[in-house]
Amino acid sequence: YRRSTKAVVYDYDVRRNYVKPISDAKGKQMIPTFSPDGRMCAYVRDNNIWIRKFDFDTEVQVTKDGELNKILNGITDWVYEEEFAVTNLMAWSPDSEYLAFVRFDESEVPEYSMQMYGEGLYPGYYEYKYPKAGQKNSKVSVHSYSVVTKDTKEMKVPVEGDFYIPRITFTQNPDQLAIM
C-alpha cells in the first residue's frame, strides 16, 4: 500500500548513550506507538501487536491470532489505508494502562493478485485482500488490552452490519475511548 511501511525500529537510551533494536525477534515492525508516559512502545509484527516495556527491557505479545490475508491487529486493511488515509488503529489511554486497537477480519474479502518486481529477473505475484464494489469488506472490532492485568476485552460497538471505524482515541479520561 502507499502509506504503510515495515522497518527495523531502534530505541536510543539517552542516559546510557546506547542504541538497540526495539525487538530482538526476526522481522520488521510497523506503526511504533509510544505510550504517553514514554515507558512502553506498541508495534505490529506479523499482524500481531507487541509491547516493548523499556523499564524491564521486555517484549509482551498482546495478540496471537494475526495472520497474513486473514487477521490484522492494530494496522489497517487496503480500504482504510487508501480511502481513509489511516494505517495506525492503536491508541494508548492517557495513564498508559490500556492499549485500544481495531482488529480486521479480512478472511471473507476476495483476494487480488498483482505482479511485483523484486530482486529476480522476472516478477513474482503479490496477493492481498481487495474488495471490489459489491464484495465483502473486512469485519472490524475494537479491543482494549490492560497492561496491568494482561487481559484483552472486545468492546461493544452499537452498530450492526457493514460499518467503518477509521479513528479511535482516548479522551482525557482514561476510562473513555472515542470510536469514530
Positions of PLM-derived features:
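Beta-propeller folds
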Residues: 1-180
